[in-house]
Amino acid sequence: MFGEKFRDRQKPMVLVLGLGESGLAMARWCARHGCRLRVADTREVPPNLPALEAHGIDAAFVGGPFSPVLLEGVELVAISPGLSPLAADLVPLISAAREQGIPVWGELELFSQALKALGESGYAPKVIAITGTNGKTTTTSLTGLLCERAGKKVAVAGNISPALLDKLSEAIDNTALPDVWVLELSSFQLETAHTFTPDAAVVLNITQDHLDWHGGLDAYAAAKGRIFGAQTVRVLNRDDSRVMKLAPAEDSEAEMVTFGVTEPKNDGDYGLLRDNGMIWLVQAHDRDATDEPVPKRRRKNEVVTPPNIALKRLMPADALRIRGLHNAANALAAYALTRAIGLPGAPLLHGLREYRGEPHRVELIASIDGIDYVDDSKGTNVGATVAALDGLAQRIVLIAGGDGKGQDFEPLAAPVMRWCRAVMLIGRDAPLIRAALEDTGIAMTDHATLEEATRAATALAEPGDAVLLSPACASFDMFKGYAHRAAVFRSTVEDIAAERGTMI
């Protein structure tokens, strides 16, 4: 289960760094397969320490700052995705491990090695992988549903939870290994993957997020690109220039399919068609295509005739139950992924119509007196809020602010100017958002609480508008998390409805 390096080792010593959900899963997996364990966490008493003991895992636990001393006798380092490789106490440890030839793997690499080992017994599932700054969970959940509707046994895991190795252990124990794995993967998880080769994978978008963890946008984008193996079908968002830099080289045998909110121009690509006031999900087809194989590389000076493209209408966008153009793009990505592994189209289109979306992701929670109240509390970065504004495409009173995580808020200016009636600012970094939007001419007011901001937004909104909570920030300056922030917003909207004699 641990690759060629450990094939002849009976009980290799593994150092697990970090005892979060993935760290605990890695510890359980390694213990299950007879490894000796040392578990280290910067916290003296991490919350999962009792769980480690409850599972009867014989591991030496070390709490406190990391140091290279932890490597004594270690043959493999298993690092949790929450730990930045740039952390001051982690850099010398990782450097020492590499100098000593000790592999540094994350949970995704352990999962990849396990699938390879199971493959020796004939297990050959399809693997679909999803990453991106925003839209991962929606696209992952939707892709899993589509696979089910096509009659496949599916396991959905990864960043979406449960942990990859926990889901794999459960499948092995129940002798119910799935036909298809659908994995939501963060840049953190991809950073320490080395042999991961999914059948199809998508990068939905790349915008500013977790830059402190990676050290910069280029490193963050490079981590996202690790989702593709040499033979992986690459599903790419053609509307995102950073994503398109991940397109395969011209001489590569890798297949690429694109999607976007624009009309597709190339055979096999997906997009949106606007016709007579309706928006359609479509796929481009070359009318002149033959069944003969087309060479990947063109000869020098070869004249290529532009394809004669027709657009096949798949379904109206308003047949989707998830709101916004960005969610239409997520639906196209999910459809493209499932088609890329050979699933039939008809049941997939039925599945697209069925999916209701995920909580706190551009979720309509009420319409009161003609005003929509939309919960996008999961919009914790600028890219998510830009997508929500452009996706809803209606007049909006925006509620934004919180812990900005060092982001540049300038990209908010254009969509705010286009769509917003006003902006209600909350949280620690409200002044930074105000500074970024000061030249838009849009009215902005500061509020001490989310409740106050929601009521002020209601007073300004007109019928046909939306009051949108999409903070572009993390929540921890004011709330326990984004779900707590959403609960406060919903509670306030419920109070407003009750005051107006309406139930939601």
Curated annotation (Swiss-Prot):
GO terms for biological process: cell division; cell wall organization; peptidoglycan biosynthetic process; regulation of cell shape. Pfam families: Mur_ligase_C, Mur_ligase_M, MurD-like_N. The keyword Acetylation does not apply. One of its GO terms (cellular component) is cytoplasm. Pathway: Cell wall biogenesis; peptidoglycan biosynthesis. The keyword Membrane does not apply. Its EC number is 6.3.2.9. GO terms for molecular function: ATP binding; UDP-N-acetylmuramoylalanine-D-glutamate ligase activity. ATP binds at G132, T133, N134, G135, K136, T137, T138. It is found in: Cytoplasm. Keywords: ATP-binding, Cell cycle, Cell division, Cell shape, Cell wall biogenesis/degradation, Cytoplasm, Ligase, Nucleotide-binding, Peptidoglycan synthesis. It comes from the Bacteria. It catalyses: UDP-N-acetyl-alpha-D-muramoyl-L-alanine + D-glutamate + ATP = UDP-N-acetyl-alpha-D-muramoyl-L-alanyl-D-glutamate + ADP + phosphate + H(+). Its main location: cytoplasm. Cell wall formation. Catalyzes the addition of glutamate to the nucleotide precursor UDP-N-acetylmuramoyl-L-alanine (UMA). Belongs to the MurCDEF family. HAMAP family: MurD. This is UDP-N-acetylmuramoylalanine--D-glutamate ligase. It comes from Paraburkholderia phytofirmans (strain DSM 17436 / LMG 22146 / PsJN) (Burkholderia phytofirmans).
